[in-house]
Amino acid sequence: MYEGAVQNLIDELGRLPGVGPKSAQRIAFHLLAAETADVHRLVNALVAVKERVRFCAVCGNIAEETQCRICRDPRRDDTVICVVEEPKDVVAIERTREFRGRYHVLGGAISPIEGVGPDDLRVKELMARLSEGRVTEVILATDPNLEGEATATYLARLLKPMGLKVTRLASGLPVGGDLEYADEVTLGRAFEGRRALDF
């Protein structure tokens, strides 16, 4: 245990995802040794992201305006929506340059163990977008893990009565993995080999 401010910093850093006690301590001591101007830049970046960044009113992606840049882009294909769990998945798919449609970010995945059900996700917003009638295909690009598969199955069953083409990214993505960590080639091939879901 360290005194006051140092221990408080370590504790707060340790609350970040993927940062354990040892990493929190290393980061804290790095910040203590850093130039004051460097620490101020970090603080300003943290404050700016909280003040300026919001979620897109259309798709749920991160944005600094009411709509994200993808929703504002008139060159995107309005007939295809790719459903992902988190904004980081949009970034991963965009890196492939394979997809030119629109996105819908759910804000997570169905996880009974974590107490997350369909009502906790942006499913109603997805259904509202689809009811507008422009979309002909929905690509379910949830993570290839238990929660992602449960979410994709739930959505496929929900969408079936709408008569839309519902596809899932092809295998090639490791089961239990996250889209964020897939390389561009693997993710690109998964897009090319997506398959229809029949439930």
From Swiss-Prot:
Q: Name one GO biological process term.
A: DNA recombination
Tell me the InterPro entries matching this sequence: DNA_Rcmb_RecR, Rcmb_RecR, Rcmb_RecR_Znf, TOPRIM_dom, TOPRIM_RecR
Recorded hits in PANTHER family, A to Z, give: RECOMBINATION PROTEIN RECR
Drop me one GO molecular function for this one: zinc ion binding
The family classification in the record reads:
Belongs to the RecR family.
Arranged from A to Z, the UniProt key words for this protein are:
DNA damage, DNA recombination, DNA repair, Metal-binding, Zinc, Zinc-finger
| SUPFAM superfamilies in alphabetical order | Recombination protein RecR (SSF111304)
Q: What single Pfam family name could you report for this chain, choosing any that match?
A: RecR_HhH
Tell me which residues make up the Toprim domain. 79-174
What is the protein named?
Recombination protein RecR
Q: Which residues form a coiled coil?
A: none
Start and end residues, zinc fingers (C4-type): 56-71
